[in-house]
């Protein structure tokens, strides 16, 4: 009985506590709702009650009455949602109080000086204004910071005067921000110091920029004066047409005006069961590094302005000479427009009706003689225009930097990870290309023509746009000096391959990766890399997984000629397979060579790589090997190139973007500082070259027995013994060398046989 009484008493106590708790929470909800209502009605000043609430708030805090009413709404909302009173003296709330007190003090100090007068009694004067405002709000208006502000300011103003009061207000605000943000006062002042230094440096830079702008403005004025003189000279020249045709002066455009324009801003299939191995991809290196930051374009050096004012004098002289030359040969034509480019000036010549284009083209040597130019290039006709272009080299070449091409590109699209910067065309337009639309690129040119700088510009463009999980690279550099600077960047699948014998193996591994990707596509029912990545996104959303997407792979071969000398068959087969099939798998080739002969750039390779860049070459034969047409033999070198993109019938002349070694190192160091390289073991070439499959020649084993027995090896010996041709005998010797049966060729000495004759046979 006693136990039952205790249990009953315990239950009564528990129920009493729960009732009290519910009652307290209910009271808090009611109080919170009332505070919210007061705040909203007061802020909106709804009716007599709303105006009364607002006037009361104004009586206490004056100009900060809206802040007080908003605080009422926040406090009420907290009480309704959390059903408890907040800790009103927590660290952050104390900081808020100090900020409000600081503003109240500063506002009321301002109110005293400008409204009451410096000698007026603070509290009594404020009280009179507050009472008047309470009953006649529309007649008084501004009451400073209310009675709370008056009480604080009266003390500080009496003790510290105006300046001291303002200092106290600022210190209260700073210390309040420190408590709210958790930043110490020392850190706060250090941040302010850094900001002041930043503003000072910006002001200094703006001052220097102003000097540059002034210099450019003076240059433009000089150019306009020269243009006026050029127009006058052209107008005075004799007309070509005998029928008194009215001559219009040519329009002269300058590429530098486009450089100074405003910069452009820059960086699905139903779900099916898929095996885990089909969703694996590059393991760690393909997962997104969320803290990786792309390099800024500011890491590159700004372009140096080149003075080309003298070129305008030459333009008017050349225009007169061209007209005189055409007239002397009986060709009726007129110059309609002149484009001053970075390295070349193009004169657009419009022939009259009945004048054959071939007649003007045949005058190329005479035009070069008249202009005293070392060489000219004639574009007949200009695509999309009824005019012929005569390109003449400038006296002063204006350098085009990679930074200005990236900054002044209106077609810049940060989502295109393989968009590369090439340079500027003759009209001054920034030339960009999308590697995924090319889809492969052949770069050829003589030594010193700018080929390596172009390759560095392409790689740097990709590093500035793409993160390591978005684009991977395989670099092959038999020269061992051009691409080694990129060792260690996280975008590499494997270290830069410098051994020509391993290059074929590296290309075969890329081919194997391509086949693996197509196997993934077949398992997931997708057709290309974009479709597969969309599939993986859906798979991750449905299964809450984080399977990596496939990155682009860019294979860069810096010197194809060296590879073709060492292992031409294997290299050509791998390049051909990649060129034919790799586009849909997201794999793209960039192949460079300085010897554009047919034994290096074979017909099979050229047929499968439609986009080409030709730098200066020594002969028209080399130009035809690259572009299937002449023109590259007339280029100037130092970055002067012809771009023939896929689908285009005529090449575009471009002055390539320059990139210094220091800029390349700066970009590489920044990228490495963001993320270290994590090479894929499966993509690193082995130390020992792979021997593919079994021997297909049925005479191989008999030939090995003969060589071991005779302890000598030669092609002629195999020809005599087996009565076979030279080619077959040479292939057998090469197969034995690859498998280690015989040693390498040593000139006039016989090959060394590495396999000894067994003792019992001796």
From Swiss-Prot:
It is a multi-pass membrane protein. SUPFAM superfamilies: P-loop containing nucleoside triphosphate hydrolases, Winged helix' DNA-binding domain. PROSITE patterns: FTSK. InterPro entries: AAA+_ATPase (IPR003593), FtsK/SpoIIIE/SftA (IPR050206), FtsK_alpha (IPR041027), FtsK_dom (IPR002543), Ftsk_gamma (IPR018541), P-loop_NTPase (IPR027417), WH-like_DNA-bd_sf (IPR036388), WH_DNA-bd_sf (IPR036390). GO terms for molecular function: ATP binding; ATP hydrolysis activity; DNA binding. Residues 428-624 form the FtsK domain. The chain crosses the membrane at residues 30-50, 61-81, 93-113, 140-160, 163-183. One of its GO terms (cellular component) is plasma membrane. ATP binds at residues 448-453. GO terms for biological process: cell division; chromosome segregation. Residues 1-20, 741-762 are annotated as: Disordered. It is found in: Cell membrane. Keywords: ATP-binding, Cell cycle, Cell division, Cell membrane, Chromosome partition, DNA-binding, Membrane, Nucleotide-binding, Transmembrane, Transmembrane helix. Residues 184-762 are cytoplasmic. Consists of an N-terminal domain, which is sufficient for the localization to the septal ring and is required for cell division, followed by a linker domain, and a C-terminal domain, which forms the translocation motor involved in chromosome segregation. The C-terminal domain can be further subdivided into alpha, beta and gamma subdomains. The alpha and beta subdomains form the DNA pump, and the gamma subdomain is a regulatory subdomain. Belongs to the FtsK/SpoIIIE/SftA family. Essential cell division protein that coordinates cell division and chromosome segregation. The N-terminus is involved in assembly of the cell-division machinery. The C-terminus functions as a DNA motor that moves dsDNA in an ATP-dependent manner towards the dif recombination site, which is located within the replication terminus region. Required for activation of the Xer recombinase, allowing activation of chromosome unlinking by recombination. Homohexamer. Forms a ring that surrounds DNA. This is DNA translocase FtsK. The lineage of its organism: Bacteria, Bacillati, Bacillota, Bacilli, Bacillales. The gene is ftsK.
């Amino acid at each position: 009985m006693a136990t039952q009484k205790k249990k009953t008493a315990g239950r009564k106590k528990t129920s009493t506590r729960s009732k009290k708790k519910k009652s307290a929470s209910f009271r808090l909800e009611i109080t919170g709702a009332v505070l919210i209502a007061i705040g909203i009605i007061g802020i909106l000043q709804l009716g007599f009650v709303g105006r009364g609430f607002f006037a009361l708030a104004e009586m206490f805090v004056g100009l900060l009455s809206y802040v007080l009413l908003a605080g009422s709404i926040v406090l009420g909302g907290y009480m309704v949602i959390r059903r408890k009173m907040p800790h009103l003296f927590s660290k952050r709330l104390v900081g808020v109080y100090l900020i409000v007190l600081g503003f109240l003090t500063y506002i009321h100090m301002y109110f005293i000086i400008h409204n009451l007068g410096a000698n007026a009694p603070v509290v009594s004067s404020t009280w009179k204004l507050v009472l008047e405002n309470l009953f006649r709000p529309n007649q008084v208006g501004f009451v400073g910071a209310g009675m709370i502000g008056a009480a604080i300011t009266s003390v500080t103003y009496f003790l510290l005067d105006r300046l001291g009061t303002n200092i106290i207000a600022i210190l209260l605000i700073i210390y309040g921000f420190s408590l709210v943000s958790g930043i110490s006062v020392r850190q706060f002042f250090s941040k302010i110091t850094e900001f002041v230094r930043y503003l000072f440096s910006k002001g200094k830079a703006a001052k220097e920029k102003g000097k540059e702008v002034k210099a450019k403005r003076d240059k433009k004025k000089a150019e306009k004066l020269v243009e006026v003189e050029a127009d006058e000279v052209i107008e005075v020249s004799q007309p070509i047409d005998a029928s008194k045709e009215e001559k219009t002066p040519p329009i002269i455009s300058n590429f530098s005006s486009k450089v100074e324009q405003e910069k452009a801003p820059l960086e699905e299939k139903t779900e099916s069961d898929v095996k885990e191995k089909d969703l694996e991809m590059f393991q760690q290196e393909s997962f997104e590094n969320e803290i990786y930051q792309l390099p800024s374009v500011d890491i590159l050096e700004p372009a140096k302005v080149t003075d080309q004012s003298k070129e305008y004098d030459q333009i008017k002289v050349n225009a007169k000479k061209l007209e005189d030359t055409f007239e002397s040969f009986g060709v009726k034509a007129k110059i309609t427009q002149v484009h001053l480019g970075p390295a070349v000036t193009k004169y657009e010549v419009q022939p009259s009706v009945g004048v054959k284009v071939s007649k003007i083209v045949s005058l190329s040597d005479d035009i070069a003689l008249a202009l005293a130019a070392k060489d000219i290039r004639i574009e007949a006709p200009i695509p999309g225009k009824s005019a012929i272009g005569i390109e003449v080299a400038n006296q002063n070449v204006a350098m085009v930097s990679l930074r200005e091409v990236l900054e002044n590109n209106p077609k810049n699209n940060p989502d295109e990870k393989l968009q590369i910067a090439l340079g500027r065309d003759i009209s001054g337009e920034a030339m960009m290309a999308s590697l995924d639309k090319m889809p492969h690129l052949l770069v050829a040119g003589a030594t010193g023509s700018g080929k390596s700088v172009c390759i560095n510009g392409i790689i740097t463009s990709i590093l500035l746009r793409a993160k390591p999980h978005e684009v991977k690279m395989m670099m092959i550099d038999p020269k061992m000096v051009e691409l080694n600077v990129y060792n260690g960047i996280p975008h590499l699948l494997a270290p830069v391959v410098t051994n020509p014998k391993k290059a074929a193996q590296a290309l075969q591994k890329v081919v194997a990766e391509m086949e693996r990707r197509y196997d993934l596509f077949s398992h997931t029912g997708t057709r290309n890399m974009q479709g597969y990545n969309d599939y993986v996104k859906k798979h991750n959303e449905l299964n809450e997984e984080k399977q990596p997407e496939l990155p682009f792979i860019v294979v860069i071969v810096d010197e194809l000629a060296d590879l073709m000398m060492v292992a031409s068959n294997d290299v050509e087969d791998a390049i051909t397979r990649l060129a034919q099939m790799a586009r849909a798998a997201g794999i793209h080739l960039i192949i460079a060579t300085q010897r554009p002969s047919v034994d290096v750039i074979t017909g099979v390779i050229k047929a499968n790589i439609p986009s080409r860049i030709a730098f200066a070459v020594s002969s028209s034969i080399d130009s035809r090997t690259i572009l299937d047409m002449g023109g590259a033999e007339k280029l100037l070198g130092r970055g002067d190139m012809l771009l023939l993109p896929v689908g285009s019938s005529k090449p575009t002349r471009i002055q390539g973007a320059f990139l210094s070694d220091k800029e390349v190192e700066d970009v590489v160091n920044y990228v490495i500082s963001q993320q270290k390289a994590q090479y894929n073991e499966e993509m690193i070439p082995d130390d020992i070259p792979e021997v593919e499959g079994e021997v297909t020649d049925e005479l191989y084993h008999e030939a090995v027995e003969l060589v071991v027995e005779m302890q000598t090896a030669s092609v002629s010996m195999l020809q005599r013994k087996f009565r076979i041709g030279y080619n077959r005998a040479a292939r057998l010797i090469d197969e034995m060398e690859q498998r280690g049966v015989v040693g390498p060729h040593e000139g006039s000495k016989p090959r060394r046989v590495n396999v000894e004759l067994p003792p019992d046979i001796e």
